[in-house]
């Protein structure tokens, strides 16, 4: 992938950009095999990759510069701002949005937040696109509600320029720290969730719910999990750390009993909406801590699917699963290092199948799906 920002030394986020994709996949596969070297793996499936540019459905832009000439991008470690509107990871559809946002920031008087001086209002612009219909969700992250009335007043101009903006919100993040969002979300549109579709499964995106950033590869990840589950004698499963329900909604059949657990209420609202659309009445989604939910149960289903954050599922949940011994565990991980550590805590299981998904091209990161079977 060619990137003028990288070539000019202005951005180094894509550290592997000079390596061809096949070389990147080989290096990632070698890393994964090294992490799982102590465990016999019955089947290594071929790695899955997607487009090498224009694949991201989300932009997280630090706003800097001045109200008349805002920059959208990032801050270097020394505080120097860098405009990343031309980043080739973003689809072409993002360019007109960035182009309209810059004059809008001036129109609305949204002074960019200055980290060094701790002054200003507009901290971040968060943009998400639906791969199914091109609709977009735009979030303004502000330090306070001081400029909210001005933003509302100027908003009709932006909506006229960009009719693809279906959901627009203001998030209030008052803390002087590099935290992307605060707890308060103020909706400026009637529509509160963005509709998307993966493999004919409706998924909804709300402001404070996690959603995969590479739809092409995520679609294949969900479809693979569905195919693996369909090959197993399973009538009841848990989907822990379920997010908006991507895995569970793909894996469930009308006859299957499924419980999805996720701590974020916004994500659970999305999952419930999807289940209702699909007419899946035996699916239950609850906004709870996944570990606390599981360890409070006196029995387990045949299959437990886990998709934890980078820290992994942790020893308490591993100990519980070891004791309760569900027949199958499917582990989806964005950090193979913590997954390997967790598998070490599950000595009663063997690795049936592993597949790498290149969700993050040009970096050392990847997603991995692992099927564990009770010995």
Swiss-Prot record:
List positions binding [4Fe-4S] cluster.
Answer: 3, 11, 14, 87
Binding residues annotated for S-adenosyl-L-methionine, in chain numbering: 212, 241, 262, 307
- InterPro entries referenced in this protein's UniProt entry, alphabetically: 23SrRNA_MeTrfase_RlmC, MeTrfase_TrmA_AS, MeTrfase_TrmA_CS, SAM-dependent_MTases_sf, U5_MeTrfase_fam
The alphabetized list of GO BP terms reads: rRNA base methylation
Q: In which domain of life is the source organism classified?
A: Bacteria
Catalytic activity as recorded in UniProt:
uridine(747) in 23S rRNA + S-adenosyl-L-methionine = 5-methyluridine(747) in 23S rRNA + S-adenosyl-L-homocysteine + H(+)
What PROSITE patterns does its record include?
Answer: SAM_MT_RNA_M5U, TRMA_1, TRMA_2
Task: Recite the UniProt keywords alphabetically.
Answer: 4Fe-4S, Iron, Iron-sulfur, Metal-binding, Methyltransferase, rRNA processing, S-adenosyl-L-methionine, Transferase
One function term, GO molecular function aspect = iron ion binding
Q: Which residues form the active site?
A: 334 (nucleophile)
Q: Can you tell me which family this protein belongs to? A: Belongs to the class I-like SAM-binding methyltransferase superfamily. RNA M5U methyltransferase family. RlmC subfamily.
Q: Which PANTHER family match?
A: RNA M5U METHYLTRANSFERASE, TRNA (URACIL(54)-C(5))-METHYLTRANSFERASE
Its function, per the record, reads:
Catalyzes the formation of 5-methyl-uridine at position 747 (m5U747) in 23S rRNA.
NCBIfam families xrefs: meth_trns_rumB
Q: What is this protein called?
A: 23S rRNA (uracil(747)-C(5))-methyltransferase RlmC
